[in-house]
Swiss-Prot record:
Coiled coil: none annotated. It is an enzyme of class 2 (transferase). Its cofactor is Mg(2+). One of its GO terms (biological process) is polyphosphate biosynthetic process. Keywords: ATP-binding, Kinase, Magnesium, Metal-binding, Nucleotide-binding, Phosphoprotein, Transferase. This is Polyphosphate kinase. Catalyzes the reversible transfer of the terminal phosphate of ATP to form a long-chain polyphosphate (polyP). GO terms for molecular function: ATP binding; metal ion binding; polyphosphate kinase activity. The active site is at H443. An intermediate of this reaction is the autophosphorylated ppk in which a phosphate is covalently linked to a histidine residue through a N-P bond. Its EC number is 2.7.4.1. GO terms for cellular component: polyphosphate kinase complex. The keyword Magnesium applies.
């Protein structure tokens, strides 16, 4: 009798098993940021800073992602998410996770950060802790600095509940007595002046050499009765409302800048999505506020401390409680060269920020602005800052008679006003300013300089993974390439033509660009590794990006894993791919690095049977980057630069066992910390010492 051997069928996974929800993955990233506030590797004031970063991130999460999901729910839209969760299910899970995270945030602040700061001589004094002299000083500060800027608003039929600005600090005050007109007033709202600092330092002569601070909220609370003469304030409670801050622009607008200005004014008063109150706020008060803002109880967050932690900043005089100062390195070839053009003619120059200085990029623009042989400068600007040195140099170049073209992305989220101001500065200087393509954000990072040399026109280019923002370049990790490779420079020239003109899609020699060729080529590169793996050859993919959400690429990576391709993903923030699932993704490992610097480099590595492909790009692996943005992907062809990026920018991070987190198959993240028998490896710290 012959025995029949049946082979087990591979597991079949549904949507929820295959994909991690995008919104919940964003929250998970912010939880990793929050854990930095208790990481013993971080100095005390840096721990506090991570608490504030967590607050800012969460504010934006509610303003954009929660607000969008709430709109889907209210409008009963049948949206299709890769994981199959409905808006209602997503909002429920967000609420549970966010409430727990915020409670932990304030627990860390009150039980760890504040006590440790007090041990170092830095205190945030409550009303009952002030000496008489300090109380007198605070009262005078209130009378001279705060009271003149306050606008108390009584709540009665003639004074309806005011429209309060998004994320502003406010107080609701319960009152007894009658006002000057004999009216019985029970409630009033007092908005805190946004122009005043949220933390006020007491004079040294009143603190015995210690660094004592008082919260603005505490000052207003103590003296709020002064704003209601003849009445008694029986209660004063902080609150803060977060509103929908997403902008909606139609594609048929005649003037993008003017349309944006109109939208920006409405952002301050969008639909409420979250209410924060202090824990001492009585039930009848927060229920009243919930009703006024049309919010449900699950959208209420009761916190044990100031409701506006994102603004809890002060210039603390304790440098030893911060990271050691770091001076970015300038490549040797640039130190030796009299001008940057001669250095770039000798070789391509790779810059790895913030370990290497951003100043060579500024130097390129400055020398171009002043060089009589330079004819034209073209640059994309996504986030640069209104007071940017780069913007001033471009304006100077235009005034010097150079042909300056700036492609400014007005719709860079939360930088819209700044970018409108930048556009005005450059237009007044005589530069040509365009706003890119309606319906597609221009996210590519490119500079092109055209210079006359020996009766010929020679092009110089810079391509990068990060914004032309000198401040961000000190805290974000990014790559930039200074090059005179004429194929690359020609490609950059053609993309600028595409952005400023109205022609058809241009054909490029070296660069990949979204929304045209990038996605399809990435699919082809993964397919090539699949073919090699099936042929029994080594196959490997390493991807380092900020986010991975695009379903076609995720499915292609699953296919590659099933074929035996070894895949390492270094994803700082959102990851919708689920690793380690038997029969689907057991050859995929996902890690996230969260540390001193914000990881921002985008690097794609494909083994390609030993003839490695290495790309640096402005694009994350997200639908918006690949299909709704103008992005550039740069091949690194120089063998030495390839090796350097692999060793420093990929392998180094795969070895990290100090700042890394590993994504588990159940969607949770596990801290990857070295054991006693392992040598500690901090990728960012290694780069601080290794960059030459």
């Amino acid at each position: 009798m012959n025995s029949v051997v049946t082979q087990a069928s591979p597991p079949v996974y549904g949507q929820v098993e295959r994909y991690i929800n995008r919104e919940l993955s964003i929250l998970d990233f912010n939880l990793r940021v929050l854990e930095q506030a208790v990481d013993p590797l971080n100095p005390l004031l840096e721990k506090l800073n991570f608490l504030l970063i967590f607050s800012r991130n969460l504010d934006e999460f509610f303003e954009i992602r929660v607000a969008t999901m709430l709109e889907h729910f209210v409008q009963e839209r049948d949206i299709q998410t890769a994981d199959g969760l409905s808006p209602q299910e997503i909002l429920h899970q967000i609420s549970e996770t966010a409430h727990a995270a915020i409670e932990r945030q304030y627990q860390i602040l009150n039980e760890q950060i504040f006590p440790q700061l007090r041990e170092e001589g830095i205190s945030f004094l409550r009303r009952g802790e002030l000496t008489q002299a300090q109380s007198n000083w605070v009262k005078k500060y209130f009378q001279e600095q705060v009271a003149p800027a306050l606008t108390p608003i009584s709540l009665d039929p003639a004074h309806p509940f005011p429209r309060l600005v998004n994320k502003s600090l406010n107080f609701i005050v319960t009152l007894e007595g009658k006002d000057a007109f004999g009216r019985q007033i029970d409630l009033a709202v007092v908005p805190a002046p946004h122009s005043l600092p949220r933390v006020v330092r007491l004079p040294d002569e009143l603190t015995e050499g210690k660094e004592h601070h008082v919260m603005l909220s505490s000052i207003i609370h103590t003296h709020v009765s002064d704003s209601f003469p003849g009445m008694t304030a029986t209660g004063c409670y902080q609150f803060r409302v977060t509103r929908n801050a997403d902008l909606t622009l139609t594609e048929d607008v005649e003037d993008l800048a003017e349309a944006l200005k109109d939208e920006l004014s409405s952002r301050r008063f969008g639909r409420a999505v979250r209410l924060e109150v202090n824990k001492n706020c009585p039930t009848h008060i927060y229920e009243y506020l919930l009703k006024e803002f049309d919010l449900d109880t699950h959208q209420l967050y009761r916190v044990d401390g100031p409701v506006n932690l994102a603004r809890l900043v002060s210039d603390f005089k304790r440098p030893y409680l911060r990271y050691e100062p770091h001076t970015p390195v300038i490549p040797k070839i640039l130190k030796k060269s009299a001008n940057i053009f001669s250095a770039m003619q000798k070789q391509d120059i790779l810059l790895h920020h913030p370990f290497e200085s951003f100043s060579p990029v500024i130097r390129l623009l400055r020398e171009a602005a002043q060089d009589p042989h330079v004819l034209a400068i073209k640059q994309t600007l996504y986030r640069s800052g209104a007071n940017s040195e780069i913007v001033q140099i471009l304006a100077e170049a235009a005034r010097n008679g150079k042909e300056v073209t700036a492609v400014i992305e007005l719709r860079a989220r939360f930088d819209e006003e700044s970018n409108i101001a930048v556009a005005n500065v450059l237009q007044e200087a005589g530069a040509v300013v365009v706003y890119g393509i309606v319906g597609y954000k221009t996210h590519a990072k490119m500079i092109l300089v055209v210079r006359r040399e020996n009766q010929k026109l020679v092009r110089y280019a810079h391509l990068g993974t990060g914004n032309y923002h000198a401040g961000n370049a000190k805290i974000y990790t990014d790559y930039g390439l200074l090059t005179t490779n004429q194929d690359l420079c020609e490609d950059v020239h053609r993309i600028f033509q595409e952005l400023t003109g109205m022609g058809k899609m241009v054909k490029l020699k070296k660069l990949l660009h979204a929304p045209f060729t990038l996605h399809s080529q990435l699919m082809n590169f993964i397919e090539n590794e699949i073919v090699l793996a099936k042929a029994g050859k080594p196959a490997k993919i390493i991807i380092k990006v900020n986010a991975l959400t695009e379903v076609q690429l995720i499915n292609k990576l699953y296919e590659a894993s099933q074929a035996g391709v070894k895949i390492e993903l270094i994803i700082r923030s959102i990851c919708c791919l689920r690793p380690g699932l038997a029969g689907l993704s057991e050859n995929i490992r996902v890690r996230s690095i969260v540390g001193r610097f914000l990881e921002h480099t985008r690097v794609y590595y494909f083994y390609n049977n030993g003839d490695t492909r290495v790309y640096c790009s402005s694009a994350d692996w997200m639908e918006r980057n690949l299909f709704k943005r103008v992005e550039v992907c740069l091949p690194i062809e120089n063998t030495g630069l390839k090796k350097r990026i692999y060793q420093q920018g990929l392998e180094n991070y795969l070895m990290d066992n100090q700042q890394s987190w590993l994504l588990q198959s159940d969607g949770s993240w596990c801290r990857n910390i070295s054991t006693e028998d392992q040598k500690p490896h901090n990728a960012q710290q290694m780069l601080l010492g290794d960059i030459i």
